[in-house]
Amino acid sequence: MNFFDVCVTIVTLPLFYTFAEKMAKNLTHTAVLKDKVILITGGTGFLGQKLIQKLLDIGTPRKIIIFSRDEFKQHEMGQSLSDPKGKLRFFLGDVRDLARLERAFKGVDIVIHAAALKQVPALEYNPLEAIKTNILGTQNVIDAALNNNVKKVLLVSTDKAVNPVNLYGATKLCAERLLVAANAYRKNEKIAGFSVVRYGNVIGSRGSIVEILERQKDSGLVTLTDKRMTRFWITGEGAVELVLDALSLMKGGEIFIPKLKAMMLKDLLKTVAPNCKVKIIGIRPGEKIHETLLTSDEVRRTRDIKNHYLIEPEHDWWKTEHLKNFSYVPTDFSYTSDKVRHLKPEELKSMLTL
């Protein structure tokens, strides 16, 4: 059994892990991260903070570098996190600045690229800013990683990149394509290279509907765009686990997608603000009624690896021997938020308390 098989055996466990299974997963992550220097772009964001806390809890990385442009958030983060072993480093910078990235990436083993502009309505009215950060910034990350021989680069992407109807999704689709294509420029095939994780909305993240509803409910009136609207949801903890699993499994070029449940937004309103009146305001620019995590074209090269799906790249450098024990999904497979199982109210409540 090779390393990939061992990792898959450990990370593709049932949704609700036993204590022993959680220990097995943690051992895998511990081994992959041992003595590594890890840099997270956008490290002061919601995912970055969750991820950094997890890395500190694991304890085996040699150094954790938070790369972001907001010095106050870095200050707050430094004050709030317990770092008795002095593993944290804060690096002010913007992914638009290649020279700054070049300096930050010196000696780095793993880069998790989470920096992005993501507020859909704002980006519709500021398109060039979205392109500068989400596309050109991603290319800067790639160039800096290649020039510094970074072993692994993992892009954090979104379901908005699938059949995009807004600028945010289009920029993330471009970022995904750039990451996958970058593997052709690897100097050493033994280096894992560049891969992607793609998931849905993160419960409780900054600017999410949960945050909006929490602000609105005190007034007794909450807003809903469309009663039919559905969304994929993942907890912050689930997003962190996906990132760590991908770092354990990646060979370079894959897109990792978790198996998620979805929900109707009207059910979320009933859970978060059960006693409030609801005002229907209509879909905002760039929104969909339902989201999807796989295009029909991607289905034909997607494998089911238990708790995740893995999209294979369409490049001649891609090797599949390590995946021979995992089947492709059916050709008529569809992964959309209106067709997967929807969360029950009690499940929603449980996720909201995580």
Regions found by a protein language model. Give the residues of each.
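N-terminal Rossmann NAD(P)H-binding glycine-rich loop of SDR-like oxidoreductase domains
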Residues: 38-54
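Rossmann-fold scaffold of SDR-type NAD(P)-dependent oxidoreductases
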Residues: 41, 105-114, 155
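Conserved glycine-rich Rossmann-like NAD(P)H-binding loop of the short-chain dehydrogenase/reductase
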Residues: 60-73
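Conserved Rossmann-fold cofactor-binding substructure of NAD(P)-dependent oxidoreductases
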Residues: 89-110
